[in-house]
Amino acid sequence: MALPRPTSPHARGSNRTPAIMRLVLGACVPGLLTLTWLYGPGTLLNLAWASLVALACEAAMLALRKRPPGVFLKDGSALVTALLLAVALPPYAPWWLTLVATFFALVFGKHLYGGLGQNPFNPAMLGYVVALVSFPLEMTRWPSPDSALGLPDSLREFLGLATRPDAWAHATALDVLKTDRSLTVDELFAGNPAFGHLGSAGSEWVNLAFLLGGLFLLWRRLFTWHAPLGMLAGLFAMSLLFWNGSGSDSHGSPLFHLFSGATMLGAFFIVTDPVSGATSNRGRLVFGLGVGVLTYVIRAWGGYPDGMAFAVLLMNLAAPTIDYYTRPRTYGHRKAERGFKAGD
């Protein structure tokens, strides 16, 4: 009896790209619902619009590259990018801001380099940084959790029809801590509605929700613990090093930084990107540490309140070098070959 001899791989896993993307989308649901609960339906409007723009850009670029649109549109990667942008952008972002960020993420962050699996930078963070650098005023329109708008007002904000579009602008705790150095941190927490129990008001709950979703992905083994732990450890260590207990010039406590801004979103949904990050476990740990350290440096001394996106893009640049110096031991050799050799 002749036995079939199919080509390798003979052992097949269940983690195909569409299945992975569905898990990531599902893990973002707690954070998405928390954002909607605290800040109103603006985030859902961002998500719906970003998804339409992402799919349109994906289809157009696939057509230009003469690739079958049906196959690649179903993998869910464009929707994941749209979701990450939707939860990162302010809930009251105008429609054109979401369009610009999503367009740059899909076209310049993904397809310019060859599509899924070829991008050296995280597409969502690239689109976010383009929006932040180009339109800083619109990127600061975060409302207070106790003054969230309903659907009609959120829709007017989204369409740019509001009579006073800046009326609901609200400084986050990271903004206040960077600009108000006359008060101690304890005084800021006691007298400013931007601060919650651990970090920014509202942001601490959003971070807890994304932490829950990230732990679910970790439990499902979609990624290893190295990059998230490295990032959180780097951020924690830097904030602990410069924390003096009360002075506002210490830039906030370790817990404050862990539960403010986009910390947990970055730790579990951004730095774990298998394409733009490091590949070995040791490299992922170094990559995460670098993101955490750079995030704190930008938060404390940079020109932006939250430096997560910039930190990720800078470490994306360093990822090939990290991979080169953290190569695992090759089977049959006693130790890994590291560093550049003569003639390389």
From Swiss-Prot:
Enzyme Commission (EC) number: 7.-.-.-
FMN phosphoryl threonine sites (modified residues): 172
Signal peptide region: none
Domain of life: Bacteria
A cellular component annotation (GO) from this entry: plasma membrane
Paired cysteines (S-S): none
Membrane topology qualifier: Multi-pass membrane protein
Coiled coil: none
Localization per record: Cell inner membrane
GO biological process annotation, one example: transmembrane transport
Pfam family, one: NQR2_RnfD_RnfE
TM stretches of this protein: 23-43, 44-64, 77-99, 120-140, 198-218, 222-242, 252-272, 285-305, 306-326
InterPro entries: NqrB/RnfD, RnfD_bac
Task performed by this protein: Part of a membrane-bound complex that couples electron transfer with translocation of ions across the membrane.
Family: Belongs to the NqrB/RnfD family.
Subunit structure: The complex is composed of six subunits: RnfA, RnfB, RnfC, RnfD, RnfE and RnfG.
PANTHER family, A to Z: ELECTRON TRANSPORT COMPLEX PROTEIN RNFD, ION-TRANSLOCATING OXIDOREDUCTASE COMPLEX SUBUNIT D
Name of protein: Ion-translocating oxidoreductase complex subunit D
Organism in which the protein naturally occurs: Pseudomonas aeruginosa (strain LESB58)
Phylogenetic lineage: Bacteria, Pseudomonadati, Pseudomonadota, Gammaproteobacteria, Pseudomonadales
